[in-house]
Each structure stands twice: as structure tokens, then as C-alpha cells.
């Protein structure tokens, strides 16, 4: 009897261990890289007087992705819960790596285009015919909107351009370090990311430590290593909308790199010609990022670095973001973004809101 009891316990423990290991090795979505957009189709089943739309999805998955794995997406709306289903390019990767894929849009088939606008749902799933499995790895919701195109004439009254509302992104920023091209993680630079609604013209980033601007290096009368910003995600319509639409229904995530502000330096190269580096791990305290957009102050972001250089606030981990970027609230100033929904962040990441995050006033 005792032998039987011990055997049952061992089998249960073994099964529990296998289950735990299996769960830890499942692929996960990098949430801030999920980007759902609307692809406008310039006909409705051959009728070019009416435009429709199809969903397009770009996302990244943390490995592992095993042999035989196939990522796919289901999209639906009220009355058509499984409107379209489409496969996404899928490779084989190990744990610790990620896979980027884009799918949907015209590849779904233009004949499946819809004129529906309003709330939609979508699910990222993974099946494996070899293993006989089919699982859900992300569920989301979004809002589809439309406006007339910028065309003129009696035949274009139903030429609508479609897009997904991404206002929820605007109050959410990211602070993180990136490795040097030569020294890797032994020498890191400060990066700050944030969203704008509109075009990314004339961006001038600045960062302050305890109220004093840092990262400015001047050599022979000229600034060197000037920080710069560029978009790493661009969400825009596939066709031009009418001029009355705020910022042309365009959202960009800007990434600003500070080449003279370092997270750490273990490269052993010394200070060099331009003097001591500014090292965040040697300068704990309060930092503030400011961006001038078209010569006007448009964003501020505050964060605190602890002794040793850590500035993580735990929001990304608690929210299962899928990467180690630090999430911070963004103060939005001025009117360059136009009219936007200031409560949209509560449904951030397509209905997967952040844990412990409060938007800046």
C-alpha cells in the first residue's frame, strides 16, 4: 500500500514538473511589438465605387518555436466572430530568441474585404500539426475607423479609407539601454521611445540629470555625438484621407538615442579625447527627458536611476510585456497631436492594460 502511494506521488510530481517546464517553454508575444493596422482595398468584390478593408498584423514572438509550429490569426466583429483567418510566416527559433512576422492585408484575398467599422477582436494562435496542438498566445481588441479619401468627384462618395485607432499608445513611453556596436553590453547608451500622432518632422531630444542638461559634448567649437530620433514603428493609412482628419490618422513611435549618455562602461577603453563619459550607473537620481517637436516642447518623461544604474519600475514585468524595456508615463504638451482620446491608455496593448501604470496628468 505504501509502495503504491509513493508511486502515485512520484508520478504526480513528475507530471507536475513536466507541466511546469512545458509552460515555461511556451512562446510569448512581445506586446509592444503587436501592431494591427487596416489595409484599405479599393473595391468591393470588383465594384470600384466602394472601398473595403482587411486586417494586417505585424508582431514578434519570443521563442521557442518548434519544428512544425505555425502562427496564425483570427479576426472577428459582431455578427462575424471568425470573419477572416490567415497564416503568418513562422520559423524555428530557440528560447532566448524572437521571431518577427507580418501577415494579412491583401494576402487574405480582396474578395473578403469588409465595410464594417467599430470594435473588433483578434487572436494570435499557434498550431503544430506534428505535435497535434493548437493554442492561443494573445487575444486583443481594437476599434476600426474610416474617413473619406482625399479624392473628389461623384464616383468617390464611398471611397473610404480605414484605420485602427492607436491613441492608447500616446501616454506610454519606454526607457532602455542598447548595446554598443563594438563592445556590446559592456558599453550601453540611453534610449527613450514615445509615440506621436502626426509626422515626425524636426525632433530635438534633450535629457536632464537633477535639472542640468547632460549628453552635450563640444569639440573645437562644435557639438559631437548629437542625439537623434527616428521612428521604429509607423502606423499610417494605405491611402490618403481627407484633409479634415487630425494628423492624417498617422501614429509613429519615435526612438531617441543619446550617444553621449551611457548606462555603463566596462569596455576598458578609457575616457578618450572628449573627457569623462556620463555614466548613469555612477549618477543615481532623477532624470527628465524633453523633446522639442517643430521647436515646441511636446513631451516630457521622468524616471529615477537607483545606485548601480537600475531604473526598472517593475511595470513591464508585472504586465508581461515580453521584453525588458522600462515603461514610463509620458506628459503630452501642446496641440500638435490634435484631438485624441486621453482615456484610451486604459485599454492599452489592445485590451491588455498595464499593471501598476497611471498616465501622466
Residue ranges of model-derived segments:
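A detector of low-complexity, intrinsically disordered, Ser/Thr/Gly/Pro/Ala-rich segments
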Residues: 2, 15, 35-38
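Positively charged n-region of N-terminal signal peptides that target proteins for export
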Residues: 1-7
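Contiguous segments within soluble domain cores/interaction surfaces
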Residues: 24-135, 164-290, 299-301, 307, ...
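Alpha-helix boundary/interfacial micro-motifs
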Residues: 19, 23, 302, 311-313
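Bacterial N-terminal signal peptides
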Residues: 8-19
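Low-complexity, Pro/Ser/Thr- and charge-rich linker/hinge segments at domain boundaries
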Residues: 143-163, 308-327
